[in-house]
Design a protein with these regions (language model features):
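Conserved SAM-binding loop
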Residues: 99
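Class I SAM-dependent methyltransferase "Motif I" SAM/SAH-binding loop
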Residues: 67-71
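Conserved beta-strand/loop positions that form the S-adenosyl-L-methionine
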Residues: 66, 89
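Class I S-adenosyl-L-methionine
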Residues: 182-189, 193-229
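Conserved SAM/SAH-binding beta-strand->alpha-helix loop
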Residues: 92
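S-adenosyl-L-methionine
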Residues: 2-62, 72-80, 103-132
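Conserved beta-strand signature within the Rossmann-like core of class I S-adenosyl-L-methionine
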Residues: 170-177
Length: 229
């Protein structure tokens, strides 16, 4: 992280949904029975084709950092796993193109180079990853948009049409959120695929993302769900 002080001005999640969504299980089963037939967007197909050549040629551990934002988490994961290939995906070109250098120069030992930041729509990208049979060791989804209104449950990853593909990616899936209910719902949805996970409080000294830093500075508890296969 840089020396810039993180101010605690993040608001708590506001929701009209006090417990897990009553239709979540039904929604997940619907998406299992009726897989998405939406055409793959051209820019995502092109981005996937380019990184797929690198992944297929790599013989080591591959880590996927979904919804990577400005890429801080991707760089940190790459630094923590120097022998791995770390791939960060985000739909926003603006976020991807921001030159964040917290990791590259903080130890005086040069740049971290074992990662790639890719602009792509994850709704399409996940489907391509599954079709190409990428062997992902760890799949991170850090602080996804919570969509806290009950009517928006299908905009949450576990309520989306691509959830069957999401849950297929990675030997270990790691989610973080400041809304514990989001993780509890994801955990329930994963159980439909006979996958188990555990939720724990995060007390890391070094936040993985700018959102995590802001939430912690605001006094909010952040949570992590780990799903093992």
């Amino acid at each position: 992280m840089s020396n810039t002080e993180i101010t605690g001005d993040s608001r708590m999640i506001e929701t009209n949904q006090p417990d897990m969504h009553e239709k979540l299980v039904e929604i997940v089963h619907k998406h299992i029975a009726h897989p998405s037939q939406k055409p793959i967007q051209a820019h995502t197909q092109q981005a996937f084709d380019e990184i797929n050549h690198i992944v297929q040629a790599f013989s080591g551990e591959v880590i996927l950092d979904s919804c990577c934002g400005v890429g801080q988490s991707t760089r940190l994961l790459a630094k923590q796993n120097p022998d791995a290939l770390v791939i960060g995906i985000d739909k926003s070109a603006h976020r991807i193109n921001r030159n964040v250098d917290e990791v590259e120069h903080d130890d005086g030992q040069g740049r971290v180079e074992n990662y790639h930041l890719i602009r792509a729509d994850l709704n399409d990208f996940y489907r391509l990853v599954v079709t190409a049979n990428w062997q992902i060791s760890q799949h991170y989804i850090l602080y996804p948009n919570p969509w806290p209104k009950a009517k928006h449950v299908q905009r949450r990853w576990h309520g989306s049409a691509v959830f069957p593909q999401i849950i297929a990616v990675g030997q270990e899936i790691i989610l973080r959120s400041n809304w514990r209910l989001y993780l509890e719902e994801f955990q329930l949805a994963a159980s439909i695929f006979s996958l188990q996970g555990d939720i724990s409080a995060i007390n890391d000294a070094q936040p993985l993302t700018p959102f995590e830093a802001k939430y912690q500075a605001s006094g909010q508890q952040c949570w992590q769900l780990r799903i093992f296969k």
